[in-house]
């Protein structure tokens, strides 16, 4: 999504007709701007181990990434996304030995947290990104998705900082568009996030 944002914001001449987006939350504003310039946007979920795309759909503003493509299977085990496919990497090559990717039934545990509803996969975040603040679990990706839904936010990252009282507290690092002006995101999220999810500091991502 970041590279497409920059193409559109800089008014760069493009001949794109369609683009597959992934790797981060996809703001509706981004796909709408792209559509106005004749670019169809698709969102997907994939891994290198599976020769990339596992699920895909045309972007429609909904949180899911679509259904499994032919030859791919998705299941949820203890909140974790497991995958199985007709074609995938044989394993990881380490120290002259091939280590298999999958369990005895052929399933690969991705360490991604997700849910499946009506056959469509929605990603919640990485299992190992979850942190706790005052005993409450915070999934950074969930907070990031909310922040990037603001029309003047290009991308956002939530990182935990250590805190003596709470254990950890969330901090937001945000990239704004050129028309952002003076936005008070701390005020904007007050009725959209639980108190424990609200960042205690807001930092601006430095320009490249």
Region locations from a protein language model:
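Gly/Ser/Thr-rich phosphate-binding loop
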Residues: 7-62, 73
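Hydrophobic/anchoring residues in structured secondary elements
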Residues: 21, 158, 203-204
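Glycine-rich beta-strand-to-loop/alpha-helix junction loops that act as flexible
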Residues: 21-24, 45, 84-86, 134-136
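Alpha-helix capping/helix-boundary segments
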Residues: 3-4, 25-26, 88
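AMP-binding/adenylate-forming catalytic core of the ANL superfamily
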Residues: 85, 113-198
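Conserved ATP/PPi-binding loop(s) of AMP-dependent carboxylate-activating enzymes
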Residues: 67-71, 77-105, 136-138
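Short beta-strand-to-turn element immediately C-terminal to the catalytic PLP-Schiff-base lysine
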Residues: 54-58, 77, 84, 175
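AMP-binding/adenylate-forming catalytic domain of the ANL superfamily
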Residues: 194-208
């Amino acid at each position: 999504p970041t590279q497409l944002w920059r193409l559109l914001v800089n008014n760069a001449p493009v001949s794109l007709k369609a683009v597959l987006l992934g790797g981060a939350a996809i703001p509706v504003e981004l796909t709408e701007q792209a559509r106005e310039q004749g670019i169809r946007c698709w969102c997907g979920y994939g891994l290198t181990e599976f020769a990339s795309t596992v699920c895909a759909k045309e972007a429609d503003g909904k949180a899911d990434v679509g259904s499994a493509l032919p030859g791919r299977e998705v299941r949820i085990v203890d909140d974790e996304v497991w995958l199985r496919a007709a074609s995938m990497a044989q394993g990881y090559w380490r120290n002259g030995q091939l280590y298999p990717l999958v369990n005895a039934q052929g399933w690969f545990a991705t360490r991604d947290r997700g849910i499946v509803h009506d056959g469509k996969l929605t990603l919640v975040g990485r299992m190992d990104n979850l942190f706790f603040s005052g005993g409450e679990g915070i999934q950074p990706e969930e907070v990031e998705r909310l922040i990037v839904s603001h029309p003047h936010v290009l991308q956002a990252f939530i990182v935990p900082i250590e805190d003596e009282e709470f254990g950890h507290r969330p901090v937001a690092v945000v990239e704004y568009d050129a028309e952002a002006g003076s936005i008070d995101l701390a005020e904007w999220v007050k009725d959209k996030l639980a108190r424990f999810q609200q960042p205690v500091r807001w930092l601006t991502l430095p320009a490249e």
